Swiss-Prot record:
Belongs to the DeoC/FbaB aldolase family. DeoC type 1 subfamily. The active site is at 89 (proton donor/acceptor), 152 (schiff-base intermediate with acetaldehyde), 181 (proton donor/acceptor). This is Deoxyribose-phosphate aldolase. The gene is deoC. Pathway: Carbohydrate degradation; 2-deoxy-D-ribose 1-phosphate degradation; D-glyceraldehyde 3-phosphate and acetaldehyde from 2-deoxy-alpha-D-ribose 1-phosphate: step 2/2. Keywords: Cytoplasm, Lyase, Schiff base. The lineage of its organism: Bacteria, Bacillati, Bacillota, Bacilli, Bacillales. One of its GO terms (biological process) is carbohydrate catabolic process. It catalyses: 2-deoxy-D-ribose 5-phosphate = D-glyceraldehyde 3-phosphate + acetaldehyde.
Length: 223
């Protein structure tokens, strides 16, 4: 298994400098990761630097809380695509899900999917650490109904990250034709292998190089 091609090489910390982001981009070229996952302010740079390389440009929408309006998320998506994003990872409206407002949650996802249609993959971050199992299932079902390409465990900025149990539940819920992304706390090759065995088809990690080299040093970030 080519683990590198399952990894979104990620830098989302608020204090990331251009030098930090360029390092991630160069590592993505070298190790041929699936994508770089960066904040929207870096999308144009990443798209320019990765032109001609088989590495997608992934960014985040409504991140990390998911509490911005649907209209804002749709605009962010269009803006990111215009600047060169080919994948977007959006955060659901977690509070609305917990309120039982499934209509709002689905519309939120649907509008991002429509904004990205034919131009970018949409991954839906459900923030598993804040949800009950029943809520995780509902979030996955609403994501599929709204037309998302992937469901994703975590932002890496909340109270917990991916677990093999959550990945298995998400995979069981969405079936074989929708992607499942494990992110948050995946720091070693052993972690990554566990997630893939549980049903993950993509891994979000900042410790991507350590994972590929099977090297635990440098693997300290939450993402």
């Amino acid at each position: 298994m080519n683990i590198a091609k399952l990894i979104d090489h990620t830098i989302l910390k608020a204090n990331a400098t251009k030098e930090d982001v360029m390092k991630v981009i160069e590592e993505a070229k070298e190790y041929k990761f699936a994508s770089v996952c960066i904040n929207p302010t870096w999308v144009k740079l990443a798209a320019e630097e990765l032109a001609g390389h088989d590495v997608d440009v992934c960014t985040v929408i409504g991140f990390p809380l998911g509490a911005s309006t649907t209209e804002t998320k749709a605009f962010e998506t269009k803006d990111a695509i215009a600047k060169g994003a080919t994948e977007v990872d959006m955060v659901i409206n977690v509070g609305a899900l917990k309120d039982g407002d499934d209509e709002l949650v689905e519309k939120d996802i649907y509008e991002v999917v429509q904004a990205a249609k034919g131009k970018a993959l949409v991954k839906v971050i459900i923030e598993t650490c804040l949800l009950t199992d029943e809520e995780k299932v509902r979030a996955c079902e609403l994501s599929v109904k709204a037309g998302a390409d992937f469901v994703k465990t975590s932002t890496g900025f909340s109270t917990g990250g991916a677990t093999a149990e959550d990945i298995a539940l998400m995979r069981k819920t969405v079936g074989p034709n929708v992607g499942v992304k494990a992110s948050g706390g995946v720091r070693t090759r052993e972690d990554a292998d566990k997630m893939v065995a549980a049903g993950a088809s993509r891994i979000g990690a900042s410790a991507s190089v350590a994972i590929v080299l099977n090297d635990a040093k440098d693997a300290t970030d939450n993402y």
